[in-house]
Structure formats: structure tokens, C-alpha cells
Amino acid sequence: TNYPKQFVDLDDDFTLFQKTFNRIQSLSNKFIKIKEVLIVTNEKYRYLVLQQLEKLNNNLKFRLILEPISLNTAPSLTLASFAAVNSNLVVLPSDHYIKNDKILTSSIQKAVRHLDDHCIFLLGTKPKSNQSSYGYITYTGNETIKDVTGFVEKPDSNLAQELISNGNSLWNSGIFILKSKTWLNAISITNKLIYKSIEKSWKKKTTDGLFERPDRKSFSKSSSKSIDYAVIEKAISISLKIKLIELKTKWSDLGEYNSLDSIYRKNNKGNIIQGEVIEKDTFNTTV
């Protein structure tokens, strides 16, 4: 679409993208020093991103890395890792709802304190229903930091219910904490095509003011894989530890409009209303 949901103001406040950026600002404290924010987005959204950033009270340095074509999250994270070599990375999707930023900050701080060169941290949330559109992470242990034992991507409702009943699974929030060199080492082993293509595209990048543009030809040769498929689910085979921390606040991946039901209350007509609206013969609608 020309106007992705993360750039839409859903509640007369800030867009999901703006809320994510503000969330990053709240992360910066005596425990975590934010060096810079890497915004990896598609070339066609560059001015939209700048317009939304201009409306914020921003105190952080940011860089705009523009993907020439849309691939998936593994190439995006590989770009960010080449851009921030020898750094700790907090990977935050810009289209998620998170109710309590303080709880998120606390969870990320725990991960950063225990981070090393051979592990990746995930944040997971307690399943609220047998939702089949989310990924599930299975784990062992009752400690704050848990060991991941497996992944089930978008199970059917019966399997999802079984996972919930077992009591040892969380929804995958898509939030990762890791070292850039850990990712680059892992992706170079599990998917050489992504690593080589993105490495070459980054070396041949051009800079135009605020915009950093990876080379299109090299970038286009990369395969389109998610972070989970490219590395996380193959971690055991490359001696990479995957650790899990529960994010104990309300979270939602707003992938579809019906997912708004999880964060906004419906009125007696089944409508979700934001702003001043006159309802007439309107039912089961988001306005």
C-alpha cells in the first residue's frame, strides 16, 4: 500500500511509527546509551518518515537507510548490522502496539545486561487466545531469562490451543536484542546469499543528504527471508543460544484491521470509534 498502517494516526495522538521512535527515546537512560537510531525503510517512504519525525521532540541522532525494493526482515537487519558494526542492537518493528513502555524498557535492560557474542534475546508475550496469525516460541525454565526450545509459526487454532495449554509458550513479539557481529556471523553461515548480497550493496551504497541508499543491483540479488527463518530457527545447528524474556504488558501486532479489537473497546453497535463521529446505521465498523 502507499500508506502503511504504521504511518496512520489511529487515535488522534501519534502514529505507530512515531510511538516506536518515542519508545526508543524512553530507552535511553543510565543503563542504556542510545548511540543512534537506524531507520530501515523502503525508498518510497523516505519523505513520509521525515515528515513524521519532524513532528516529534527528538533528541536522538538518526540515520535513514533506504531499501530499493521490499524484501524481508533478514536483509533489513543485515543492512543495519553493517551500518552499526560492533554495536548492540535493539530491533523494534514500527507497526506494533505496546501498552507500557516502562515494562518494555525494563525487559530490554535485562537482555542487554546478559548479552554476549553467542546469544540472541527475544521478547515474547503471554498468549491471550489461540491466535493462528502469530508465531509461538516454546521454552524451558521458570526463570526470568528462559531457554528457547522451538518455534511454531502460525499454527492452526487447535495446535495453538495445545501450545497454550502446555503452559510453556509465548507469542513471538518480533523484538530482538543482539550484537551486530553476532547477526553477521550467523547470517554468513545460514544464508550466504543474503550476507554476500547485502554486504556488497552496503559497500556500494550512496549517500544523498540524510538518505543512505544501498546499491539496488546487489540488494536485489538477496533472498527474501524473515529473521526467524534465516537464523533464529537454525540457531542450534550453529551453536547460537536463543534466550527469551517475557514482555509482561499488553502487546499486539496490528497486522489486520480486525486486530484493532485487541486494543480498542467496541461500543454497543460493535463499532470502534476514534475522534468525533456521528453514527447512523453503522455496525461492526472501525471509524
Say what each PLM segment does.
Residues 101-221, 239:
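Conserved core of the sugar-phosphate nucleotidyltransferase
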Residues 9-91, 96-99, 142:
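Conserved N-terminal catalytic core of the sugar/cofactor nucleotidyltransferase
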Residues 7, 64, 120-122, 241-244:
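Conserved beta-strand scaffold positions in the cores of enzyme catalytic domains, especially
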Residues 41, 92, 155, 178, ...:
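A conserved hydrophobic position in a structured secondary element of the catalytic/binding core
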Residues 89, 175-176, 224, 252:
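A residue-level structural signature of the nucleotidyltransferase/glycosyltransferase Rossmann-like core
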Residues 1:
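N-terminal nucleotide-binding beta1-loop-alpha1 segment
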Residues 181-287:
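Left-handed beta-helix
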